[in-house]
Amino acid sequence: MTVVAVVIHAGKTFGGGLEELRKVLAEAGHSKPLWYEVRKSREAPKAVRKAVKQGAKLVFVWGGDGMVQRCIDALHGSEVPIAILPAGTGNLLATSLGIPKDVAEATEIGLHGEHRTLDLGVMNGERFAAMAGTGFDAIMVNDTDSDEKEKLGRVAYLRSSLKAMRAKSVRMRIRLDGEVWFRGKASCVLIGNIGTVTGGLEVFADASPSDGELDLGVVTAKNAWQWVRVFSEMAMGRSDESHLIEKGRGKRIDVKLKRKRIYELDGGARPRTRRLKVRIEAGSITICVPTTAAP
């Protein structure tokens, strides 16, 4: 029987919690899976590597996008698939792949679903599966309290998003596949491997995590009113027509900022930097998805 491991972000929960997970796994013949609980998502890679060393052939990841990102960064390039148990707030990757926020159903997908090979983005040496960037999104992620997210869910992002709208734009130069693509001031740079952000807003309509390219968006909104317009255009599916948004696609993205800014990968904030070096890593990770998932 396949050796199964479970890596858990302690404190995160959904459905019947870990008790339900243990029950579902036991009923499927996995009464004693390799079991690891970590207090911080940054501790997850060590647990993942230990699980693989102990023979795990399938790794369940219990947590949100940040937890999944840490585990993916540790498992990339291996043949060991990840099964997502979406216990976070946003769960962007799980949602985009059709993985439900239901313990029994998500576990069933891990045990008996299809194995889909996905691309990953690599930003400053770290891999991400959903979204990464700097500016508005990074400020919002950095300023949202984890306890508030647990209590309020997506509503917790509202306060920090209002603050992010007031942040000053920064001058930058962006190269896309080696050519200068953007030069000027911008308030947000977003790089997507999938198309939808928190709140269900579609940013990149044609994005796919298996097309060998990353989608790039730059927002030049200068104040809260312009940000309201940007979000309205996204909600109406008209972001491609916006004069406040520029979009592109490619395999390599190089962002140089005039001033240091924090950045984020899959909802996890990272230290301030003046340089973002990004590339696509095609077919780098295997994820368990529903058998009806689109190719």
Question: Which ranges hold each PLM region?
Answer:
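ATP/NTP phosphate-donor binding region
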Residues: 1-59, 69, 294
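Glycine-rich beta-strand-to-loop/alpha-helix junction loops that act as flexible
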Residues: 10, 62-64, 85-87, 193
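ATP/nucleoside-binding phosphotransfer catalytic cores, i.e., glycine-rich phosphate-binding loops
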Residues: 176-178, 208, 218-295
